[in-house]
């Protein structure tokens, strides 16, 4: 199925990064930020070929003169014009394919509004003329990638976190829980606590610098109080980071205070359960007979699950909530940043999946997506 002439395209549009490539490959071909940037200033030089908008890496590299916008917020597309630009960029610039020649597998957040799915379907068929398409739920794909059909997937991305219990390949919708706390909120929180240290980050471009600091230096503490005490007593936990202009900043307890928000949403004023409690609550909404299987197959995925120490901390927190005799296993595959994409690549290349596509012939109106994709 790796025959690129007919291979399906797998496009995992995240709130933060877009992962895209061909079905049957073991990793995405292109990964770029889901951003559209527009110039903040007027062009004064003629012949520079200035554009009115930039997408992805190009927007990132020119961020100093642009205002950056993310068209996907909390896992849901909020700006369709910009989203179309991102898809156009995906097909024509990153993958260099004609979308009218390949089936397209898209991903979506669980509990995605119906109108969103319909709009995706409409754009794929009417704007890009795709021959066939399918919309799959991210968490189901990440479980696929780990080689399981039963388990609970805790997918923590840039815009949204959810826990999705899956039994024998079926998502259990009544037990899906969604937490609007994810990577972007952690970046904002890190911006705030760095301000307390005297470093000011305010613009959309500076936020990207803070995101980089977060990705390079943050980690999850196993015991928050003990870690705070260690940080106060010595400078052993301090790390330095060089800003683009050459200044060096030092960060200490911010390294673990930032990700701690995942377990303690009150840090950012959110009245909600942390990811450990959300996972537990999700399991408790399932039938009593399948809970044991879910505890033993808790799969982490998404970029926000990449903090060192997060799996051990989850293990500790869920063990404290669950019955003492039950076996708890947290699976954190090393490629979990891309496991949704990898699951999509596996799914779209299965021979049994080929009759699942919604074809252009079947498309008479966008509501078909609810009948074929579940």
From Swiss-Prot:
Point out residues bearing the modification N-acetylaspartate: 3
**What's an example GO cellular component term for this entry?**
actin cytoskeleton
Write down the SUPFAM superfamilies for this protein, in alphabetical order.
Actin-like ATPase domain
Give the stretches traversing the membrane. Answer: none
- Recite the UniProt keywords alphabetically: Acetylation, ATP-binding, Cytoplasm, Cytoskeleton, Hydrolase, Muscle protein, Nucleotide-binding
Q: Which CDD domains match?
A: ASKHA_NBD_actin
InterPro entries on file: Actin (IPR004000), Actin/actin-like_CS (IPR020902), Actin_CS (IPR004001), ATPase_NBD (IPR043129)
Please name the top-level EC class of this enzyme: hydrolase
Keyword hit for Acetylation: yes
| A single GO molecular function term of this UniProt record | ATP binding
- Kindly state which reaction or reactions the protein catalyses: ATP + H2O = ADP + phosphate + H(+)
Compartments (UniProt record): Cytoplasm, Cytoskeleton
Q: State its Enzyme Commission number(s).
A: 3.6.4.-
Gene3D superfamilies per the UniProt record, alphabetical: 3.30.420.40, Actin, Chain A, domain 4
Q: Which residues form the propeptide?
A: 1-2
Q: Describe its function.
A: Actins are highly conserved proteins that are involved in various types of cell motility and are ubiquitously expressed in all eukaryotic cells.
Q: Which family does it belong to?
A: Belongs to the actin family.
Q: Spell out the protein name for this chain.
A: Actin, muscle
Organism annotation = Strongylocentrotus purpuratus
């Amino acid at each position: 199925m790796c025959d690129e002439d007919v291979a399906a395209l797998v496009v995992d549009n995240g709130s933060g990064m877009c992962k895209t490539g061909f079905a049957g490959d073991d990793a995405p071909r292109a990964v770029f930020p889901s951003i559209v940037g527009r110039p903040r200033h007027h062009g004064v030089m003629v012949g520079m070929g200035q554009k009115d908008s930039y997408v992805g890496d190009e927007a990132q590299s020119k961020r100093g003169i642009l205002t950056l916008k993310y068209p996907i917020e909390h896992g849901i597309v909020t700006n369709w014009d910009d989203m179309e630009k991102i898809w156009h960029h995906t097909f024509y610039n990153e993958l260099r394919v004609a979308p009218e020649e390949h089936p397209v597998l898209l991903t979506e957040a669980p509990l995605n509004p119906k109108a969103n799915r319909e709009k995706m379907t409409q754009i794929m068929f009417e704007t890009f003329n795709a021959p066939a398409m399918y919309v799959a739920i991210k968490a189901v794909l990440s479980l696929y990638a780990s080689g399981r059909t039963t388990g609970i997937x805790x997918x923590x991305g840039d815009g949204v976190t959810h826990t999705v219990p899956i039994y024998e390949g079926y998502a259990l919708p009544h037990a899906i829980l969604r937490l609007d706390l994810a990577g972007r909120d952690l970046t904002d929180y890190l911006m705030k606590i760095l301000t307390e240290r005297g470093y000011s980050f305010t613009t959309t471009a500076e936020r990207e610098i803070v995101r980089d600091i977060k990705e390079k230096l943050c980690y999850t503490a196993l015991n928050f109080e003990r870690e705070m005490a260690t940080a106060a007593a010595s400078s052993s936990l301090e790390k330095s980071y060089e800003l683009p202009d050459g200044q060096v900043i030092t960060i200490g307890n911010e390294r673990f205070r930032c990700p701690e928000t995942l377990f303690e949403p009150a840090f950012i004023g959110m009245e909600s359960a942390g990811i450990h409690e959300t996972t537990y609550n999700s399991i408790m909404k399932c039938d009593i007979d399948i809970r044991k299987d879910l505890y033993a197959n808790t799969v982490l995925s998404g970029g926000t699950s990449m903090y060192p120490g997060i799996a051990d901390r989850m293990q500790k927190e869920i063990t404290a909530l669950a019955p003492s005799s039950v076996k708890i296993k947290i699976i954190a595959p090393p490629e979990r940043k891309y496991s949704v994409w990898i699951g999509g690549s596996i799914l779209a290349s299965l021979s049994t999946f080929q009759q699942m596509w919604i074809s252009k012939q079947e498309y008479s109106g966008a509501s078909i997506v609810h009948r074929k994709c579940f």
